[in-house]
């Protein structure tokens, strides 16, 4: 469950290391985001020479949360950290690599490029 002011790790190679959620997209008064939701973020920590730099405002899709998500068969999937992947306006990832596992729910939400780049889909 991600809300404004939440900090997330960045699970791609765009150069950003940490982002802070500043808005949850998908409704005028939406308060929380979960796996597969798009958020607007500010880059808080970045490596030199990356695609993005500190202070940039970017869009990202959440790929892992500590809260987890309930599946149709009644099982829950939870992760060790909160992580996001930076995306462009057309929902394609800005980076060329994805680090760490991602949830299978991204496939249902049309983030096929992220699912195909991920080393593990849980």
Swiss-Prot record:
Keywords: Ribonucleoprotein, Ribosomal protein, RNA-binding, rRNA-binding. One of its GO terms (molecular function) is large ribosomal subunit rRNA binding. GO terms for cellular component: cytosolic large ribosomal subunit. InterPro entries: Ribosomal_uL14 (IPR000218), Ribosomal_uL14_bac-type (IPR005745), Ribosomal_uL14_CS (IPR019972), Ribosomal_uL14_sf (IPR036853). Binds to 23S rRNA. Forms part of two intersubunit bridges in the 70S ribosome. Part of the 50S ribosomal subunit. Forms a cluster with proteins L3 and L19. In the 70S ribosome, L14 and L19 interact and together make contacts with the 16S rRNA in bridges B5 and B8. This is Large ribosomal subunit protein uL14. It comes from Caldicellulosiruptor saccharolyticus (strain ATCC 43494 / DSM 8903 / Tp8T 6331). The gene is rplN.
């Amino acid at each position: 469950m991600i809300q404004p002011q939440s900090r997330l790790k960045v699970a791609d190679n765009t150069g950003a290391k940490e982002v802070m959620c500043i808005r949850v997209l998908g409704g005028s008064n939406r308060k929380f985001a979960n796996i597969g939701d798009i958020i607007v973020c500010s880059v808080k920590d970045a490596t030199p020479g990356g695609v993005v730099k500190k202070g940039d405002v970017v869009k990202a899709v959440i790929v892992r949360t500590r809260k987890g998500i309930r599946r149709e068969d009644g099982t829950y999937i939870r992760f060790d950290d909160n992580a996001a992947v930076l995306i462009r306006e057309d929902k394609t990832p800005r980076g060329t690599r994805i680090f760490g596992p991602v949830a299978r729910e991204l496939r249902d939400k049309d983030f096929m490029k992220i699912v195909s780049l991920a080393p593990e889909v849980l």
